[in-house]
A protein has these predicted regions:
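Short alpha-helical DNA-recognition segment
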Residues: 15-34
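A short, Lys/Arg-rich alpha-helix, primarily the initiator
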Residues: 1-13
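Short, charged recognition helix plus adjacent turn
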Residues: 62-80
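Residues that mark the N-terminal boundary/hinge immediately upstream of a DNA-recognition element
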Residues: 6, 17, 43-46, 57
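DNA major-groove recognition helix of helix-turn-helix/homeodomain DNA-binding modules
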Residues: 26, 45-60
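Alpha-helical residues within the helix-turn-helix
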Residues: 12, 23, 52
Length: 80
């Protein structure tokens, strides 16, 4: 699935507006709309913010997998 469609589907599944997600990413509603509609690219910092906000993996959000794996906090820290 195209990541733009996935972003829109996840946002709508959470009953959130483009303006609300735009605010989360420090963008206007129009700025976020441009990401969902292909007029702007999703920046890696914004992807990380969305993954944490939705508690979903980047692989799922960008459409590399259809498995809605939640983020595993322990895997993001290196064991010493």
């Amino acid at each position: 699935m195209d990541y733009r469609k996935r972003l829109k589907n996840v946002r709508e599944d959470h009953d959130l507006s483009q303006a609300e997600i735009g605010h989360l990413l420090n963008k206007s509603q129009q700025g976020y709309n441009h990401i969902e509609n292909g007029r702007a690219e999703l920046k890696i910092d914004d992807l990380i913010t969305l993954c944490k906000f939705y508690n979903l993996s980047a692989d799922y959000l960008i459409g590399l997998t259809d498995s809605q794996k939640e983020l595993d906090e322990s895997s993001s820290h290196h064991k010493q």
